[in-house]
Amino acid sequence: MIFKEYATQVINLVNKSTEDIRERNHGLQGTLYLASVEGHAPRLYAQWITAFHKKNPHVQYSLWNGNSDDVVHRVMNGLCDLAIIIEPHNAEGVESLPVYQEPWVAMIPASNPLSQNPSPTIRACELLPYELFIPSRTSRLEEISKWFGPDAKPIVRGRIAHLLSAYELTRLGVGITIYPASAGDIANLTDVCIKEIVEPANTASYILIWNKYRQLSHVAEEFLNFIKER
């Protein structure tokens, strides 16, 4: 057992020395495996990668997206280095860094009477008579249901992981979508109306996560440090 541990240490040192020499000669290399939810997370990655790429042009990127539960699963099983999710999370062994906040909004079909009100906000109770689409994360249904009070039950017609699907269903008048405010980034505002949900006001809080029990690759450590310094 002692010999095996010693041999592992020697191999790790050799690999690190080889990596250091390659980095001195050619710059930082390797592949960053990233995952995220939708909403504002893809924009964060785009901003970070753009700036990081200017300093490290040889790094490659593999990006994957899904709902928060799926993303956490990938982190905990070593399928990605770093990931962005929306709180809350209850995964043990996850380190996190807050990176962004935005309000929740209702994306309403232009044909819906609610879209005729010029107010930029809407109370949660006003959505009760209508069929809703919400993010697909398991815990999100319970969270959103609480917005309507203990005696009310929203009509949740669908659970959606991808923003484009939510937008298309809303645009065609199937229902109203509840999503973080960045949903408005892709919306054609002649087809849908975006209103911030108030009473209660709620915030979508994005966090960057990684598995504290797994050693990050060198390129992932450099990327994480780069984000922390911004």
State each model region's role:
Residues 95-105, 110, 177, 181, ...:
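Short beta-strand->loop
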Residues 94-132:
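Flexible hinge/capping segments at coil-to-helix
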Residues 1-23, 29:
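Alpha-helical "hinge/linker" immediately C-terminal to small N-terminal DNA-binding modules
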Residues 31-35, 83, 107, 133, ...:
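Short, well-ordered beta-strand segments
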Residues 29-92, 160:
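Central regulatory/effector-binding core of bacterial HTH transcription factors
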Residues 67-72, 76-80, 85-86, 137-195:
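Hydrophobic hinge/microswitch elements
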Residues 44, 174, 193-230:
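A late-sequence structural motif
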Residues 120-124, 129-152, 216-224:
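Secondary-structure junction motif
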